[in-house]
């Protein structure tokens, strides 16, 4: 369907980044961005890791908008990418008899990691407004010996305003391949009538997933301690949280009413994953809500709202 004269053309934003290990041990980058995506000033962490914040200057997506992010991490490089703010997906536009729901907004992430690379992708949450249509695709290729850490938190509807997903829909496709084997292949499609299902969202508006593909298989005791610590990190957080092993690495799931709880738990897991690798402890990202930093580092006592699933 073509745009009418009264409609602005959809956004086609993109980011392309290549990370390489420099002679001085720091990670350097090359690439660029196309509006409305923008690369903010990066900085180098104490361990030489390149820290890169991404900004979506349009503030959100509507039906027809597309964002494409392509990442390549060369051998030995270390990088961490996050976003400056939550990604907002507004109600769809372009409704017609042919497309009664309207057009979809699309976000695509492609990442390729060479052996020895370490890439962390931890953006802030995505908020899907009532009536919004979002299709998200993530394709990750990890060479043996590389480390991938990725997290995704999605809120379905602005629940603080009493809003649900309405006529909206969220679709997510995630595939992670390590060498010649698939580590994760997922397809998810959610709409409002499915959310109360106890085998799905159970009436909760927030879902989150954290996946770590380790460079090498962990020893049994090492993995057991990592999972035990991750379960202890649920202390004081509301929602249902589960964590389990991958070959090699781990996967953690969150389902509940608080994107803050998901973010705090994932940050605690991030610290443990860094420690297992013998890497420096991560700092609370500068672009994340600063008032949450103390909660992330010093958990509150457990509450009756916490559900600890394995």
Curated annotation (Swiss-Prot):
GO terms for cellular component: cytoplasm. Belongs to the UreD family. Pfam families: UreD. It is found in: Cytoplasm. It comes from Synechococcus sp. (strain RCC307). The keyword Transit peptide does not apply. This is Urease accessory protein UreD. UreD, UreF and UreG form a complex that acts as a GTP-hydrolysis-dependent molecular chaperone, activating the urease apoprotein by helping to assemble the nickel containing metallocenter of UreC. The UreE protein probably delivers the nickel.
